[in-house]
Amino acid sequence: TNRPTEYNTLDDRYARVVTEELMPALAKDYNISKDPEMHGIGGSSSGAIAAFTVAWERPDHFRKVLSNVGSFVNLRGGHVYPEKVLAAEKKPIRVYLCDGRNDNRGLRDGKYDVNRDWFHQNVRLMKALTAKGYDVNYSWGMNNHGQKFGGAILPEMMRWLWRDGPVSTDPNDAVERGFRQPTAKPK
């Protein structure tokens, strides 16, 4: 694979692989809802921008995005997402961004490049999403480019993304709603 090209490019190629190849293959073995409100996608670093791009390109499949230390920088043009968000028609997606002030801060060859400042670009994207009226939440920590902070708040991020799910107060309700069971495989 070529991660910078496959994950960081702002086009629909990766989204097509996920929605046209991966999801149908998974649906053969698992009972996956057809409702895009039930579908979330997330990642860290280049995986986070890839996840955002999948939902951006295919909100008919994914409506929730979890981004940890997202690479919304100029690896393959990710730094232009704030402008794309502001210029485009609003899409029906919900986004949770997580990053830290000690993430990669844009030093390149000894000089500062704002387009390669991970934290700055995540904040810019959050501000653009907010200005456009998106359902967006964020957590900024002191972390560097890694999993520690995002892992610590993962339950909070997941609860926020899926906060509008059904809740039963019936004491006799024993229906498991926390996960989906695999479909029965034909014998």
Model-derived features with residue positions:
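Non-catalytic cap/lid and distal C-terminal segments of serine-dependent acyl enzymes
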Residues: 1-187
